[in-house]
Structure formats: structure tokens, C-alpha cells
Amino acid sequence: VLAGKHTLQLYAENIGRITYGPEILDNSKGLFGSITLSDTEIGNWRMIPLAVRDCAVGELTFAPQTDGGRPCFYKGTFTVEIPADTYLDVSGWGMGEVWVNGHYAGSYWEQNAQQSIQLPAETLQKGANSLTVFELKSNGKRTMRLSDKAIFN
């Protein structure tokens, strides 16, 4: 590592919590203990919770890329003739979060039975709608579709 001040940012996913048993008293998440680099302890580090649901996705800047890697934000648009209750089919995607028109719509995980996110009519607008996806596993899938039914494995 070159001399000087450096910044390392890590994202630790928290997919659940303990809801019973003695471990419920210590349900901590994140990094704990000493942090080392080549057996040298790193000091003056801090852990900050990231409120993903409150992320201002409308302010993100996107650049065209062939492979976003992971984790990665994706952005797209879709058109709605008449706003109605619908579902966003997320089957084939790994794990992530979805925003429609800048508002948090829900999360998905390939291991869950439910493979769709409900989009109430109130979240959609006639004409163009924006879709932002924060994908953690990036398996190469780049499309989602709307469905009039919930999708389950």
C-alpha cells in the first residue's frame, strides 16, 4: 500500500435478524473487533449505517457500462398506459432493492419464494416511469417485466 491517507468503504448486507432464543440479546450487525491490514491494526475507523430505503436514487449519476459488476445500481424506464396495481417480476435477479419513480418499492432475494414486488397504482404514473435497482449479486440478468399476478417459485 502506498504511503498516505486512504479510504476503504465496505458494504455489509444485513438480510435478517434473530427473533428468538438467547442470541436475541446480542443481535449486532457489521464489523467488530480490530481491523488489520497486513497484520497492522488500523485505527480511527468508523461504521455508519446506510439507510438504503431512504437513498436519493434520483440524484445518482449513471454511466453506460457493459458489466456493472457487483454490487451495482441499474437504471431504466418503462411506460404505463393506465396506472393500475401490478407486480414487478424480479425472477432471475440475485438480491437487491428497487425504487420506482424515486420511491422505495421493495427488496428481493433469489432464495425467497416470492419473486415479485407489488407496485400499487399510486406509485405509477401515466407514461414514462423510472426504475432503479441496487443489485448485490449481479448474475448478468438485465431485464425485469411487469405482471398482473404475483410470482412465486
Please give the residue ranges for each predicted region.
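Surface-exposed beta-loop interaction hotspot
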Residues: K29-V57, T79-V80
